[in-house]
Swiss-Prot record:
Gene behind this protein: ECM14
Locations listed in the record: Vacuole; Secreted
Cysteine disulfide partners in this protein: C334-C357
Domain of life: Eukaryota
Note accompanying the cofactor annotation: Binds 1 zinc ion per subunit.
Record-linked InterPro entries: Peptidase_M14 (IPR000834)
Reported cofactor(s): Zn(2+)
Pfam families on file: Peptidase_M14
Stretch list, region Disordered: 561-582
Source organism phylogeny: Eukaryota, Fungi, Dikarya, Ascomycota, Pezizomycotina
Protein name (database record): Inactive metallocarboxypeptidase ECM14
GO-annotated cellular components: extracellular region; vacuole
GO BP: cell wall organization; proteolysis
Residues the entry annotates as binding Zn(2+): H265, E268, H397
């Protein structure tokens, strides 16, 4: 067992748990299924090996982890999920989430106007539907503002938001819930169910020590970068993964760099976890996977798990559904700006975006958000003074399962590299689909999700959430990043921002495979002698029969024959598109 597995588990145990629900942590109880599963594991597991017993003994002694000996008879035979406590009920009341089916641009405009009047929280929108959060007693007011075509074109997707929020929080742990698996945070297929870090969402107080641990353990190709400080003084930390010439902080040639970000909107926890998953896969795959080794040698990868640390902490401590950052505004009772509306390119402060109480408040001017400003300054400084050329940008959000390319601010202005943007986006969508059969739509960020038959008819509708001032447009236009995308991750609305923890690893695998496709495309001809498909990660239930391989170093040559068929049973290979050397 790798020593990293031991230390990482111990780090997670030793970091105090950040209470997700103030004053009510004692009300968390594991589900019946989880407890029964724990009993079955304890009864059916073979005795641990000597090294395992020694390892656990050391950890238990140093970090005072309780012994794994327990009495299964003390576990209740039947437990139901408790009702949300009063603190949650007081905040979310009788709120629900409704999905409206849209059929025309008039429907979109009507929903925009009504939502602005009532200051409603638009959760997500596509070319076919819009999800809106509102109190039950506001439903009649909303319907009264809508045309007849929309008054019956809606269904509830979350009936009791307070209960859904309560059930989305991780349960506090005073000890390791399953000590046999506690110190094995590998992302390898065989250890998927034993990975303690990715078994649940993690607070910032756990993420930062975990990042420092990885940087110290893999110092040959990993270091932490501090991009600046947030409004409340927290460091905005990222991984820089890449192999540079020895003792050369300033490379002689411009270093091609790819940026992957998450957590711009605080409530989108799956984006934070997915950035961490991809980072871990790149870090631990170097020297073992020929594909990853090539990517780490040819590019620097800067991965920023949360661009909005203040907002992210606030979602753990106070309001799970907080979206904006936490800076003060002219209205003291409506703090925060939507960071993804504050970037400098085509900033738009009109309509609801000029109201500090709006969920998409764009601030008082370009770069009015503290965090977007410092990240932009960092990127410009890297370009102007550190010989860096940014060649790729992936901004992870949730939800609705979409791959969006520039522009967000306009559907009439066409990006000059549209053909290449669409080609790579389709390749990314295909990689995700082959991972776990999840379908991601591809479109311009100014539109909703556009199916192919609607696109042929010219029926694309402008998205309710498209706007100027996005990170996507700024990186593409102002920083001249040729391949910039926003990925809206799982799901399509069953849970929305409250995606259950069982989706963390599958979503991570989807985006990891997408990153492989992304890097392969940017490598151009240099990628042609590598079996990229052989390095794909698959969930256990959908993993194809491919031969196992072991890569012992950057110079080792090997050949593996493996062809994957797509969902339409076509005979083309997954990565059969044209590559583009950048």
């Amino acid at each position: 067992m790798h020593i990293l597995q031991v230390i990482t588990g111990a780090t997670l145990v030793s970091v105090p748990f950040v209470s997700a629900i103030p004053s009510s942590t004692s009300e968390f109880l594991p589900s019946t299924a989880e407890q029964n599963s724990a009993v079955l594991h304890s009864q059916g597991r073979s005795p641990p090996r000597l090294w395992t017993r020694l390892r656990d003994s050391i950890i238990e002694t140093i970090w005072r982890v309780p012994s794994r000996q327990h009495n299964p008879s003390r576990i209740p035979s039947s437990l139901s999920i408790p009702r949300a406590p009063s603190s949650i009920r007081a905040r979310y009341g009788d709120d629900v989430v409704l999905r409206f089916t849209i059929r025309s641009q008039n429907d979109v405009q009507a929903l925009i106007e009504a939502s602005n009047i009532l200051f409603l929280d638009i959760w997500a929108s596509t070319n076919e539907w819009v999800d809106i959060r509102l109190a039950k007693d506001v439903v009649s007011s909303l319907l009264g503002l809508l045309p007849s075509s929309l008054r019956t074109a809606h269904v509830p997707i979350i009936h009791d938001l307070a209960q859904a929020v309560y059930e989305s929080y991780p349960q506090p742990v005073s000890s390791v819930p399953n000590p046999h698996h506690a110190f094995s945070p590998s992302v390898q297929q065989s250890s998927e169910t034993q990975n303690i870090f990715f078994q649940d969402y993690q607070p910032l107080s756990v993420i930062i020590p975990w990042m420092r641990l990885l940087a110290s353990m893999f110092s040959t190709h990993v270091r932490l970068v501090n991009l600046g400080t947030s409004y409340e003084g927290r460091e905005i930390v990222g991984f820089r993964i890449g192999v540079r010439p020895a003792n050369a902080d300033l490379p002689t040639e411009r270093r091609k760099t790819i940026v992957i970000t998450g957590g711009s909107h605080a409530r989108e926890w799956i984006g934070v976890s997915t950035v961490n998953y991809v980072a871990y896969s790149l870090i631990t795959g170097y020297g073992k996977s020929r594909a990853i080794t090539k990517l780490v040698e040819e590019f620097d990868w800067v991965l920023i798990p949360t661009m909005n640390p203040d907002g992210y902490v606030y979602t753990w401590e106070t309001d799970r559904l907080w979206r904006k950052n936490r800076q003060e505004n002219n209205l003291q009772f409506c703090p925060g700006v939507d960071l993804d509306r504050t970037w400098g390119y085509e900033w738009d402060g009109s309509d609801s975006r000029s109201n500090p109480c709006s969920e998409d408040f764009a601030g008082d001017g370009p770069f009015g958000g503290r965090e977007s400003k410092v990240i932009a300054q960092w990127a410009l400084n890297e370009t102007n003074h550190h010989n860096v050329t940014f060649v790729g940008f992936l901004d992870l959000h949730s939800y609705s399962q979409q791959i969006l390319y520039p522009y967000s601010y306009s559907c009439t202005n066409i990006p000059p590299t549209l053909e290449n943007l669409e080609e790579l986006a389709i390749g990314i969508a295909k990689a995700i689909r082959l991972t776990d059969h999840e379908h991601y739509d591809v479109s311009s960020a100014c539109e909703g999700s556009v199916s192919s038959h609607k696109k042929r008819r010219g029926a694309a509708l402008r998205s309710m959430q498209s706007a100027g001032g996005s990170a996507l447009d700024w990186f593409y236009h102002d920083l001249h990043v040729r391949y910039a995308y926003q990925l809206k991750l799982r799901d399509k609305g069953g849970y929305g921002f409250l995606l259950p923890k069982k989706n963390i690893v599958p979503t991570g695998k989807e985006v990891y495979n997408a990153v492989l496709v992304f890097g392969q495309f940017l490598l151009g001809r240099g990628a042609q002698d590598i079996d990229w498909e052989g390095d794909f990660q698959f969930p256990a239930h959908s993993r194809p029969n491919v031969p196992e391989k072991e890569y012992r170093g950057p110079d080792e040559e090997y050949e593996i024959s493996n062809q994957l068929e797509d969902d339409d049973n076509e005979n083309d290979t997954l990565l059969g598109f044209r590559t583009q050397k950048v």
